[in-house]
Amino acid sequence: ILFIATTILTAQHKAPTDWELSGLKGKVKSQRSIPYEVVTQGKTFVKGAIDRDLDTVVKIGNLDNLQKDFNPNGYLTQMRFFFKNDELYSRMEYYYNPQGQLFETRYNSDKTLYVYNPEGYLIKDATYSPGGFLKTHYNYQVDTNGKVLKEETYHANQLESTIAYTYNKQGDPVEMRYYDAQGNLLQRVESKFNKQHLAERNRTYDKDNKLVNITTKKYNSQGDCIKLQAENKLPQKQKNVATYEYKYDNQGNWIAKTTFINGEPRQIIERTLSYYE
């Protein structure tokens, strides 16, 4: 499921807020994001029409065209995705127990339930169809500090894949190993983090330990990515560089983001944020 709440690899009962996960400063009440095409005019460019949907045939909206709503504690209550014409594409709703733990999400007609161990760490989530049929579920093996050591993905109660995590002393996931249902290694990802716990480099290896891809990131002082370089080694060498320029509001949240691919402007995303007083 695309929009299940992001798996938290740190202590669940001290999970970061969705403000933090979204890189937002201040008490954000709502965030409305709209992507726009870029129109070049000689050596300059301007904002064009709202960017196209991902697929107009099977009707899949642009996932950058969305609104996030937060409760006063910084946790998501709703995410809505829109088509180019502003019609609703899909909706994700979040529900919390009195302790503040996420216990249920609803994506369109599907329902996902979340299970915690006595220490308050997430150990399972399961998604059901409207008729109550179990579609997928995830099992999380955690250590005494709540860090996810192993994540198992099941489809209709059949194991599909497993991810094993290794952490550094700072608690960052520095290695992820991906396995199929039979336990065969599919790929391995090594990650390097900065002092702000933001990923600076990912190196992806295939099952034969051959380097497939290197992705590097650079950030500005606000913690927003300003450069992403993806260098493919296999099956053929290829390198692409994305750079980003931002405009910020008084809270330090970006309200406009321009994306360049290999130096060419590709997209402008504008965000409107409202805040709790």
What is each of the regions a protein language model found here?
Residues I1-A15:
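Bacterial Sec-dependent N-terminal signal peptides
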Residues Q12-E277:
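Buried hydrophobic residues that stabilize the cores of well-folded domains
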